[in-house]
Regions:
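Short, Asp-centered acidic motifs that coordinate Mg2+ and/or phosphate
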Residues: 30, 84, 88-89, 178-179, ...
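Extracytoplasmic small-molecule ligand-binding "clamshell" domains
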Residues: 21-97, 101, 161, 241, ...
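Bilobed "Venus flytrap"/periplasmic-binding protein-like clamshell domains
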Residues: 35-38, 47-62, 94, 115-164, ...
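Bacterial N-terminal signal peptides
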Residues: 2-15
Length: 260
């Protein structure tokens, strides 16, 4: 009987310890980021991370009273590293139907639009019949690559994948590719608002698909509902206190409405 009582005490003690560990306040959020996508995330001449996603991430951490740690990645969609707990979340990713099978997402941070960009005189449109035989540049492991390989490549469109957007834009300007499928904000920054972009423009209507998504959110492990809920709550507070609108205003985005 004494042995049973001792075991019960040990079990209760261990359970209490486990509960105590679980309720420890969060002190840090490690955000993964691919720092070569201005104006969303990049490094300035001093090597500091700057951009919309960096500002939003830092504001969320400040709202939660935790330290923000940024972990550089070559590509955004590094789910194996997320699942291996090399970081806690991936900052700034479109929550597509394909990605939702692997990870969970927070509420939307802001909307995005995908467009085809080519020379003004090309006559191209985001129609796979018109793009047949044309070379379209996309970024490796991006939602646009997944869409182009799935929807356009089978129709004879030549899909060229690039690790860096700078390389993709250089290939477009030099004529090594005929067009690119990009987000409106980043291609403005990378090409259309520069001297090299004078001969280029958006061609045809926006491209919509479940493979592309129409917004950006934060990816977390499917099991980490606590972090997702904390980030959602912090985002709601930023929307209500006006900080969210202040951060987004310079980036020429359609601002999501503040929540009641």
């Amino acid at each position: 009987m004494a042995l049973i009582h001792l075991c019960a005490v040990l079990v209760f003690s261990l359970s209490s310890t486990a509960v105590a560990v679980d309720v420890q306040p969060r002190r840090e959020i490690r955000f993964a980021v691919a720092a070569h996508f201005p104006p969303f995330q990049s490094r300035n001449s001093q090597g500091q991370l700057v951009g919309l996603n960096i500002e939003l991430g830092n504001a969320l951490c400040e709202q939660l009273n935790v330290r923000c740690t940024w972990v550089d990645q070559v590509v955004m969609e590094n789910f194996p590293a997320l699942e291996a707990r090399q970081f806690d979340a991936i900052m700034g990713m479109a929550p597509t139907c394909r990605r939702r099978k692997r990870v969970s997402f927070t509420d939307d941070l802001y909307p995005i639009t995908t467009r085809l960009v080519a020379r003004k005189t090309s006559g191209l449109r985001p129609d796979r019949r018109l793009l047949k035989g044309k070379r379209v540049g996309v970024l490796v492991r991006s939602n646009r690559e997944a869409y182009a390989l799935s929807q356009w490549a089978p129709a004879g469109v030549i899909i060229r994948s690039f690790w860096l957007n700078d390389q993709l834009v250089q290939s477009l300007v030099s004529g090594d590719i005929d067009a690119t499928l990009q987000g409106v904000v980043e291609i403005r920054e990378a090409l259309l608002d520069t001297a090299d972009g004078l001969d280029f423009d958006f061609m045809g209507p926006p491209v919509s698909s479940g493979l592309l998504g129409n917004s950006v959110a934060i990816a977390v492990r499917k099991t980490d509902t606590a972090l997702r809920n904390e980030l959602n709550h912090a985002l709601e507070q930023l929307m209500q206190n006006g900080e969210y609108q202040r951060i987004l205003q310079p980036y020429r985005l359609g601002v999501l409405p503040a929540r009641p």
